[in-house]
Amino acid sequence: MKIFTFKQNRRNLVSLFVWSVFLLICAKVSAADEQKLSEKVSTDIVQIKLLKPFGNLEQVYQIENLYFAGQPDKATLEHFRSLGGETVINLRDPSELKFNERLMVHDLGLRYYNFPVPGKQPVNPSIMLATSWAIEHEGKVPIFVHCSSGNRAAVALAVHLTRKLGLTQDEAVSISERSGLTHPNTRKKLIALLKEGLKP
């Protein structure tokens, strides 16, 4: 019969402890690597440029030919036009505005779409799909997509890229958060929309 001494038992316990710590560290490193990989995948899918300032706006997010931001004024749209901009997509309800944006945009010689997305209601998938289809219809011309603060515009970006690239829910939310989505309630609406599926 094999007899273990106190020193042997202590040595075994120390070895077990060291091995457990090693496995725990490996698990944490693996989880961190997976997170970095996930972030890298999202980053590789689209290249997001932060333009600061942009006309009279503090910042605008650019993804290829698309610009996403809060409410622009005439000077901002003039700057957009100077960059070759041709189209403006407004996601605000007309009742939110105290001026005629359609008239202002047309006076600048730009095309105009208005797809109202009420800020306090669930996001209507049909409206978001219509926005995505309009972006596709316009082709490669520079397009300025906006709402009041940029949150709804970031949701529109997520929907468009999900249709175009087949993003996962996590990828779509991540890209939105890096493109102006800061409001917690709007984030919840985006997740609910993606879970339900993009059906008209």
Label every PLM stretch briefly.
Residues 7-8, 25, 149:
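Short alpha-helical segments used as structural interaction elements across diverse proteins
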